[in-house]
Swiss-Prot record:
Known function: Catalyzes the ATP-dependent phosphorylation of N-acetyl-L-glutamate.
Organism: Lawsonia intracellularis (strain PHE/MN1-00)
Official protein name in the record: Acetylglutamate kinase
GO biological process: arginine biosynthetic process via ornithine; L-arginine biosynthetic process
Pathway: Amino-acid biosynthesis; L-arginine biosynthesis; N(2)-acetyl-L-ornithine from L-glutamate: step 2/4
Domain of life: Bacteria
Length: 296
């Protein structure tokens, strides 16, 4: 390493110092999904970032998705999968595959990668200790001058309650929870949107940060420029102006709910960027779009 590179790295370490102190002992919830879960280099850098947070005294909690992996397994098993309004209709056969993939292969791969990076990760689904209590979530479509249409999505659920004691026990012992977004009502098993689970966990724990990894830079304005920061109170305009649409709508709704439940800051950031988590947390500029409450 030449002297200039060494000097640059030393400056980066010094820049991170106040943030390391600020986040010491704090809970940070990360939603892990998209391209960051597919690319080999990004998977490795994600695991290293999570391990680093843990090793410097921060408490990361990871909630992961797995839609493409579920789709691949359903195809291999010749199980047809139906989508309504972007949501997977989850019958009994599909739910068995969803649970097998999310709580099994995907979850354990992430656990193994974080462990290899030098930390201690533990894989969970919401059925462990019934810590994610859920209920059935049917889709209600409303059309002008017509009665609402209720669409049965099968075992698609929504979060009712997060039992935090299991998570606190793990992080206090230095473990990193890696969570598959599967919930239960103690009778049925439910497939839940991973963004919703991450937001609910962050809110229940009053996390310092909720970070959502996506396949875009963050929220873009109508000129396709990154919105670096927005107040919670100004988010309705993002919907009314058509700035957020499609899959970004439920993502932003989860962000809003998390802040309303006590999360200090939510950031939507680009998971395609290597070590984007560290760049967001430990640099002056940060990356992505941050959402915070207006100061009183």
């Amino acid at each position: 390493m030449d002297m200039e590179k060494a000097r640059l790295r030393s400056h980066m370490l010094i820049e991170s110092l106040p943030y390391l102190q600020k986040f010491q002992g704090k809970v940070i919830v990360i939603k892990y999904g998209g391209h960051a879960m597919k690319d080999t280099l990004l998977k490795q850098s994600f695991a290293q970032s999570i391990a680093l947070l843990n090793l410097v005294g921060i408490h990361p909690i990871v909630v992961h998705g797995g839609g493409p992996q579920i789709g691949n397994m359903l195809s291999r098993l010749n199980i047809q999968s139906e989508f309504r309004e972007g949501l997977r209709v989850t019958d009994k056969a599909t739910m068995d595959v969803v649970e097998m993939v999310l709580a099994g292969s995907v979850n354990k791969e992430i656990v193994n990668q974080v462990n290899q990076a030098g930390a201690k990760a533990v894989g969970l689904s919401g059925k462990d200790g019934a810590f994610i209590l859920a209920e059935k979530n049917d889709l209600i479509l409303t059309k002008e001058n017509q009665p609402p249409e209720i669409i049965n999505l099968g075992n698609v659920g929504r979060v009712v309650h997060i039992e935090t004691s299991l998570l606190y026990t793990l992080i206090e012992k230095g473990f990193i929870p890696i969570i598959a977004p599967v919930g239960t009502d103690n009778k049925q098993t439910y497939n839940i949107n991973a963004d919703e689970v991450a937001g609910a966990i962050a809110g229940a724990l009053k996390a310092t940060r909720l970070l959502l990894l996506t396949d875009v830079e963050g929220i873009l304005d109508l000129n396709k420029k990154l919105i670096q920061s927005i107040y919670l109170e100004d988010t309705p305009k993002l919907f009314s102006d058509g700035i957020v649409f499609g899959g970004m709508i439920p993502k932003l709704q989860c962000c809003i709910e998390a802040i309303e439940q006590g999360v200090e800051k939510v950031v939507i950031l680009d998971g395609r960027l290597e070590h984007s988590i560290l760049l967001e947390l430990f640099t002056d500029q940060g990356v992505g779009t941050e959402i915070v409450k207006k100061p009183v």
